[in-house]
């Protein structure tokens, strides 16, 4: 038996999320990968992912793993899957790893990027990949708010509504914001995230950028542990799973890069 780790990228616009769903719910990343790999490995394949992205969310660096008794050379897997996957899902890398390696247990953190287009007139070329916010945003206030969210906190206020109870205490290592030509990219690096947490962070930062809430309110909002204290969840299309970290060296390098911006 062999254990294979994949790096997978996808445009989530027309996908029903990562996790496999009934066929009538639409194409999912997990479902499409299992179908393609079962064909090229000539046996039923079950795949495990590191992050269950929602419908409409994109990924540049999703991590998956599967076990197979098939003999296909690992370096051939990315090319072999092309004919069997939708055009919006691509396997960019495949490597053989120890049998006990699991995607959700052998990583040190994740980076998400949420993109906003902040101009009155929409950009039709990018609307699949950002949230269009027409009113001018105070980016400096958003940066200050990002810094206030860094650290280890109970993020119950920023979780999705009506979600399964899980440990709400997470650590955000860094939040950075880049602004160029109307595009605002919010990078969030942490040890893990609650359902809708990054999109709710983006929504909160936009509310602060619009003056609806203030940076000074953040400690109070977190202490309330009440999802109803913040505004709407930012739309899915602006979110990208940018990277998943296998090593602390790479994690620390990205954190330092964000903090130096």
Please state what every model-predicted region is:
Residues 1-261:
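Structured-RNA-binding interfaces characteristic of tRNA pseudouridine synthases
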């Amino acid at each position: 038996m062999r254990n294979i780790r994949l790096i997978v990228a996808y445009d989530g616009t027309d996908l029903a999320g990562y996790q496999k769903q009934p066929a009538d719910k639409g194409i999912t990343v997990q479902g499409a990968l299992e179908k393609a790999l079962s064909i090229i490995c000539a046996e039923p394949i079950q795949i495990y992912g590191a992050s269950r992205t929602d419908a409409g969310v994109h990924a540049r660096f999703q991590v998956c793993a599967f076990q197979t008794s098939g003999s296909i050379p690992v370096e051939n897997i990315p090319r072999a899957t092309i004919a069997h996957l939708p055009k919006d899902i691509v396997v960019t890398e495949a490597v053989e790893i120890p049998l006990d390696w699991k995607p959700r247990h052998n990583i040190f953190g994740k980076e998400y990027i949420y993109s906003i287009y902040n101009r009155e007139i929409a950009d039709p070329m990018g609307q699949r990949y950002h949230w269009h916010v027409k009113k001018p945003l105070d980016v400096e206030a958003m940066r200050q708010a990002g810094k206030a969210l860094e650290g280890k906190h109970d993020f119950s206020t920023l979780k999705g509504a009506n979600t399964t109870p899980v440990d709400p205490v997470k650590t955000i290592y860094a939040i950075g914001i880049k602004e160029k030509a109307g595009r605002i990219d919010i990078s969030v690096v942490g040890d893990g995230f609650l359902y809708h947490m990054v999109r709710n962070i983006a929504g909160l930062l936009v509310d602060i950028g619009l003056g609806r809430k203030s940076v000074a309110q953040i400690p109070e909002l977190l202490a309330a542990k009440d999802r109803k204290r913040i505004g709407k969840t930012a739309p899915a299309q602006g979110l990208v799973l940018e990277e998943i970290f296998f090593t602390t060296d790479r994690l620390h390098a990205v954190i330092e890069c964000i903090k130096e911006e």
